[in-house]
Amino acid sequence: MTIEHNEINMPTKYEPSNVEAGKYKWWLEKEFFKAEGNTDKKPYSIVIPPPNVTGKLHLGHAWDTTLQDIITRMKRMQGFDTLYLPGMDHAGIATQAKVEAKLKESNVSRYDLGRENFVDKTWEWKEEYAEFIREQWEKLGLGLDYSRERFTLDDGLSDAVKKVFVTLYNKGLIYRGQYIINWDPEAKTALSDIEVIHKDIEGSFYHLKYPLTDGSGYLEVATTRPETIPGDTAVAVHPKDERYQHLIGKTIMLPILNREIPIVADEYVEREFGSGAVKITPAHDPNDFEVGNRHELPRIIVMHEDGTMNKNAGKYDGLDRFVARKEIIQDFKDLGLFIKQEPHLHSVGHSERTGAVVEPYLSLQWFVKMEPLAAEALELQKTENKVNFVPARFEKTYETWMDNIHDWCISRQLWWGHRIPAWYHKETGEIYVGESEPENLSEWEQDEDVLDTWFSSALWPFSTMGWPDTENPDFQHFFPTNTLVTGYDIIFFWVSRMIFQSVEFTGERPFKDTLIHGLVRDSEGRKMSKSLGNGVDPIEVIDKYGADSLRYTLATGSSPGQDLKFSYEKVESTWNFINKIWNASRFVLMNLDGMKYNEIDLSNVTEVSDKWILTRLNETIQAVTSLGEKYEFGEVGRTLYNFIWDDFCDWYIEIAKIPLYGEDEVAKQTTRSVLAYTLNATMRLLHPFMPFVTEEIWQNLPHEGESITIAEWPKVNEQQIDTKSSTAMATLVEVIRAVRNIRSEVNTPLSKPIVLEIKPKDTTYKEILEQNISYIERFCNPEQVTISFDVEASKTAMTAVVSGAEIFIPLEALIDLNVEIARLEKELEKWNKEVARVQGKLNNERFISKAPESVVAEERLKEKDYLDKKASVLERIETLKEV
C-alpha cells in the first residue's frame, strides 16, 4: 500500500509531545508488534527481563528495554517474525513489603487479614501497579506483543514452577535441610544474596579471654559479634600453628555460660590474623557452620526469628541482639576477661527491603543441589550451542561463579509467591511433593513457605513460551530466544540460573546471546541512589525532551559491558540533533513539489554531489547494519549522527539548493529524488532508536507501506557506490573547509570575495578541482580561482594543506593590514589583562590555601587558555608586520 502526502503536516517547531501523541496506540491497534508465529519467516525473540510489580521503572529499566526494543525493531524491519514478549515479576519480598507498609498506614498487619485475604490484597496491588508499568512502556515506545504478556504467578507459569520443583525433588536435586542463610529479623524471612545490601560500618573488634578449663591460662579471641558468644561450641586454631600445638584437644570454659567447649585444629584459621585463635559458632556463621560439620560440633541457635535472644543465651534471653552485645561485653569486663576494643570498618549486610541488619542464621530451609546442575551448564559452554556473552569477558565471570557455586536456598518465609508444593502428613510426618494436592487433603498440611522469586524467573525464557507443553507453537517457533539484555550485576542471580534450568529442562540454551550492560551512573560516575539524591525519573525526562531523545541518549551512551554516565546535557544534545533532523526534513518536504513515491527516479544521477551522498548513504547502511548485529549501538549512533548532521544536513542540503533554486527542471527532479530517497532510507535506519519522530517524518515523505515500523530495512545497493565521486567530494569538502577556516582566522565574511590559488597534488586532484569548480565558487565566493601546478605561496598569503592540494589566499586581498594589526593589538591588550588577573589570583597564597581545589584547578586552566590565546595573537601580529 502506498500512502501519499502532498501537504506538509510538520509544524515549524519540533514538539515531542505532539509528535508522540497517539502513535503508540495506533501501532497497537494495527498489531504491528504482534508476532505472527509464521514458520515461513525466520523467528527472532526477546523476552523482557520482568520488572518487579512494585511501581515506577527507573533509568536502568529504560536503558535495558530501549536496547531490547532497538534490536527487535531492527529485526522486524529485516523481515524476521519478531517477538518482544512483555511480562512482570511478582517480586516476593519486595511486593509483600510494599503491601504490608500500605496496610500499616491503617494499623492493619498481614496477620490481621490472614493469608488468603492478604494474598487477595496483593493481587489488587499487582493489577494497579501493572497498569503503571504498561503506561511507562508506552511512554518509552516499546514494541511489545501484549497478546503474549505473562506474569510470574499466572497459571501457566505456576504449572511450570511446580513441574520443575517436583522433578528436581524426585531427582534428589531439591532437599530440605538446616543451613546458614541470610535472615531478615524484621521481615522474618530468608533472603537471597541479591536482597542483601552490604554497607561499610564503623564497628569494633572485641578482644576477649577464653580461659582454659584446666586453669593453665587462656586463649585470646576477637569478634565483631559478641552477641553470638552463647552459641560458641569450639575455639579453632591452625593445625600447624606451633603456639597452640599443645592445646589441640584440650577444652575452654566458655565464659558467662560456663559451658566446656573443645579446642579444634582446622585449616580454615588464618594463623597471621589476630591471635590465630577463632571462636566457632556453627549456627550463626557460614564459615563456622562448615568447621562445625568437619568436627561434628553441636549447632546452638541463640536468637529468635525476630532478632531477640532466646533461652539458649542464658541470662540474655529476651534481649534485643544489640542490647545483648553491650551487656555481654560489660560482663566480660566485670569478670576481668576483657582485653581491648579496636575500631574496625567492616562490611555488614542489610536487608534491601527493611534495612534491618541481616543475621547469618541456621534455619530449616529448602535448597537446590547446585553442583550437578552447574556442571551441566558449564558443559554447554564447550559446545557450538553455548550462550555467547557480549562482551566475551563476562563468560569468564559466569564460569568462575558456576565453578564455585553453593547450594541455593529457595524457600522464603512469605505469603506472596509460589507456595512450595510439599505437604506434611499431620500424623505420620510423611512428606509428599507433587504437582497436584495429595488425596485426603484434610490429613495433610502444606508447607507454609513460598519459593524464592528467582526460582520462577529462572524459567522465564521457556515458561513464557508455553513450557512444559513442548508442542506449544510459540515454544516450537521462538525458543531458544535470540538475545537476553541485562546488567552485569545479575549474571550470578539470574543469567546463570536461567542457563542451568534451561539446560536441565529443555536441553537447550535459553538464549543465543546475552548482551551485558553496566549500571546507569550520574555525570560524575556515581551510582544513582536516594541518599545522594541523584536519581532520575525517565518519565520526567520524556515529558521534557521526548522519548526519542531519551532512547537515543541511553542507547548510544556507552559500549557493551560499560557503565553509562547520564546527564541532562547529553539528552539536550540529542534533542538538538532531532531538531536538526526535523528542520532538514521540513526543507526537503517543502522542496519535493508533491513528488509521489513512484516518481522517485535515480536513473539520471550524474552530479558528483548526488553520487557522493548516495555512496555515503550506502556506506552508512552497511556500517549501521553490521554494527547493529554486534550490538555496538554507541558506534551506530555516532555513524548516523555524522552522516545526518555532517554529510546530509551541512553539505548535501546546502549543495542541493543550487539545482533546486535553478532553472534546470531535470536537475531539480533528480535532486528531489535523491533528497526523498536518502531521507526515507535514513529515517528507516534511525527508526529503532527514535521510533516516534521517524514515523512522523516518514509518513510525510513519499513512501510505500502503512508504517515505518514494518517498512523494509535499507539494503546496500552496490550500483550506487561510486568511490571516484567520494574521493572528489572529500577533496572539495576539505578545500571549502580550509578556505572557511582561513576566512575565520582573519575575520573576513563570506560575502567578501577573495583571490584563491590552489596547487593540486597530482593530475587526478587537478581534474577533480577543475571539473567541480562550481562548488568552490558557490561555497568560497572567490573573485578569482587559479588551479595550477605552478602557483606558489606569496609572502603575504595565508596557506592551508589538504590531502589533495595546497591552498593559498593572498592577505592583502582580504584585509587592510594596518586596520587588522590595530584590531589584534587591542585584542592582545585584552588577553594581557586576563592573564594578569588570573595570575594575580594564583600568586595569592591566601587564595591558594583557602579556595577549594576545584576552583584553583579551574583558574589554572583559565591561565593556560589565556596564555595560549595571547601567544596566538602575538604570532599573528608579527606575521602581519613582516608583510
Curated annotation (Swiss-Prot):
Gene3D superfamilies: HUPs, Isoleucyl-tRNA Synthetase, Domain 1, Valyl-tRNA synthetase, C-terminal domain, Valyl/Leucyl/Isoleucyl-tRNA synthetase, editing domain. It is found in: Cytoplasm. One of its GO terms (biological process) is valyl-tRNA aminoacylation. It catalyses: tRNA(Val) + L-valine + ATP = L-valyl-tRNA(Val) + AMP + diphosphate. It is an enzyme of class 6 (ligase). Its EC number is 6.1.1.9. Keywords: Aminoacyl-tRNA synthetase, ATP-binding, Coiled coil, Cytoplasm, Ligase, Nucleotide-binding, Protein biosynthesis. A motif ('HIGH' region) lies at residues 51-61. One of its GO terms (molecular function) is ATP binding. It holds the Pfam family Val_tRNA-synt_C. Catalyzes the attachment of valine to tRNA(Val). As ValRS can inadvertently accommodate and process structurally similar amino acids such as threonine, to avoid such errors, it has a 'posttransfer' editing activity that hydrolyzes mischarged Thr-tRNA(Val) in a tRNA-dependent manner. Monomer. ValRS has two distinct active sites: one for aminoacylation and one for editing. The misactivated threonine is translocated from the active site to the editing site. This is Valine--tRNA ligase. It comes from Listeria monocytogenes serotype 4b (strain F2365).
